[in-house]
Amino acid sequence: MAFELVGLDRLGTRMKIIFVRHGEPDYRELEERSYTGFGIDLAPLSVKGRQQAQELSKNSLLHSADLLVSSAVTRALETASYVACATGLPLRVEPLLHEWQVYESGVENFEKARTLFLENNGSLPPNSPFQYETAEEMRSRFLKSMRKYRNYQTVVVVTHRMLMRQFVPNEKIDFCQVIECEIEI
């Protein structure tokens, strides 16, 4: 697993964030039943994803935190449960740490919107064929949701790749990858 320290300048109280991307999910059962939108977010971790989360939970860096905050999405929450059991950290579920929102249905539309998002540096071009959450909206959503945790110096945040990418320069973020950064909340 890769570990990095990234400094970011924002307004307010300085907080060390230990970002963790969730483990590999298994969408098969939900896809077989044609779940879409937030329904697909009910997917649990795959067998490999559980192994990744178990390995992640051995990371000594996680023990340096004061609190564990997780997205309410099943794959993130299941990953966080392994971390909570291994570290004894108190766990808070934060519904606003969900994955990037695309206001179109279907995997194909999601991927097309993702390509458009990346090509436009996170902005939504005028007359875009796809509607989605911009990078600025994601950053704002994250910062607003984390304000209530200002009294904690170091927080583990189990969340999703697109949200993490708004705060760290990594283009590729693997399942259960750990990335440290400091953010002004």
What are these model-derived regions, one by one?
Residues 19-24, 158-164:
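Histidine-centered catalytic micro-motifs
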Residues 143-150, 157-162:
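His/acidic metal-ligating clusters that form di-metal
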Residues 3-16, 59, 92, 97-114, ...:
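Acidic, low-complexity terminal tails and accessory targeting/binding regions
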Residues 26, 76-77, 100, 163-165:
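Short, active-site-adjacent cap segments at secondary-structure transitions
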Residues 29-30, 34, 39-44, 85-141:
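Phosphate-handling substructures
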Residues 16-92, 176-179:
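Active-site-proximal alpha-helix that buttresses catalytic centers in soluble enzyme cores
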Residues 61-64, 149-153:
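Glycine-rich phosphate-binding loop signature in dinucleotide/nucleotide-binding domains
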Residues 70-74, 96, 158-162:
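Short, well-ordered beta-to-alpha junction loops that form the rim of enzyme active sites
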